[in-house]
Amino acid sequence: MSDTTILQNSTHVIKPKKSVALSGVPAGNTALCTVGKSGNDLHYRGYDILDLAEHCEFEEVAHLLIHGKLPTRDELAAYKTKLKALRGLPANVRTVLEALPAASHPMDVMRTGVSALGCTLPEKEGHTVSGARDIADKLLASLSSILLYW
């Protein structure tokens, strides 16, 4: 495709418009990721996502995002064991999933499953950072179970 396009049945020439509205403007500060520091790149906690995608397992990247660092071999094994133990779904969540139409979109199923999980296992008021990480681990472990059960 060229930089200019002629509309069918028209003499008008249009040019693609580059979106520059927020180009170079920080949208927020986070320790989790940086976007576009050196072009069209994305880094998670300082690691280039292309390197992570090529060299890491899913659980390693999840550990990096949730717990702040890449795990050692022993930490990774323990983390996988923890996630496996958290995969179970409460009966109330299974009942909600059973009521969903078979033609539902998987994203809608996950959203509904997470909502049911939140109602069944509500967060405590004023939980700690460690408690927030436990919640994230439970959600991470539950998403595949939600889809597979449905």
Report residues per predicted region:
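Hydrophobic alpha-helical bundle cores within soluble ligand-binding/oligomerization subdomains
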Residues: 2-150
